[in-house]
Amino acid sequence: MRAALIGAGQIARQHLSCLKKLPGVELAAICDLSPATAEAAAERYCVRAWFTDHRAMLEKIRPDVVHVTTPPTSHFGPAIDSFNAGAHVIVEKPAAPTIEELETLVQRAREAGRHLVEDHNYLFNQAPQEILRRIEIGEFGAVIHVEVLICLDILGPCGFADPNSPHPALTLAGGAIADFLPHLASLAHLFVGPHRTAQTVWTKRKPSPLPFDEFRAVLDAERGTAALCFSASAQPDAFWLRVYGERMQATANLFETRLTFERPRNVPKPLRPFFSGLEEGKTIRRAALATLLRKFKEPGAYEGLWELLARTYGALADGAAPPLSASHVLEVNRMVEALKPKKRQL
């Protein structure tokens, strides 16, 4: 399959690195508005063709799949043009700044007989996949509640709060935090399904160019409840996923490889914390070593993206549906829409 990429920024590097190693995939072209950026990316990843006009690229290269990794508010045009050129589209999150634009993208994909896949990469990390496996085989029991908490210093030297170089995500409703809502929503959706109601709190604790730096939400969903949080002040950085089931509880830090399970034990009740602590300690030590080792090899922290792309290309090559359907993308983004700050909060 012939692949092309539009938008050769930071996240594009992960897409390009993966594409170069996927069997049966030819990375045919790279496009970026900056000639220097496009040429440098093409040289780094040994891609023969580079462009500054995505329409010219689509017409000349005729790719089977296009990766749209431009800033979030600019996905719509390149995605529509890619569908019109007969390509499937893999788009970075958020796929569109409004639910109306996303619905248009999904409709155009259906009309063209193509697939739209949004990068919900954390769904395909090993930890969520292992939790999901235990749920599917009945070991976990029905999910009662899920918690997703991102602690990340976006006010530090990471680009989000630089007044001299405004980050593209600041144009989204909710600012930089909105760039993380698809991660929170997709994980909640994975374990408790589409939301029915959502209550949110958006606040700002520290002076910065960001409109908000703290976010909390509680959702009632089809299969349970969810609590979603983002904090720019809580430290250390972490990405906690906690899933509570009828027979088991799971805790994972998705910035690491840590995953622990807690279940009722057939020992005297006073001894349960002791045995649980022993098992958890062993698991955390193994995860610490695994987290260190993954820093020295690909895909590193982007294991979920690589797995998503591998499954997607495998499905497309077989003429099958990709692992993330259009209905999934719509349901997650409707949840994201419900999480965005209301006018009274802006």
Regions found by a protein language model. Give the residues of each.
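Rossmann-fold dehydrogenase core element
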Residues: 104-122, 142-145
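Alpha-helical membrane-targeting segments
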Residues: 263-299
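C-terminal helix-rich "cap/oligomerization" subdomain common to oxidoreductases
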Residues: 65-67, 297-346
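Beta-loop-alpha module in the N-terminal Rossmann-like domain of NAD(P)-dependent dehydrogenases
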Residues: 15, 49-108, 304
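Predominantly a Rossmann-like dinucleotide-binding segment in NAD(P)-dependent oxidoreductases
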Residues: 123-199, 205-207
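N-terminal Rossmann-like dinucleotide-binding module
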Residues: 1-45, 346
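Hydrophobic residues in well-ordered beta-strands that form the structural core
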Residues: 51, 91-92, 116-118, 252
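Contiguous beta-strand/loop segments that form the cofactor/metal-binding neighborhood of enzyme cores
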Residues: 179, 185-264, 306-318, 336-338
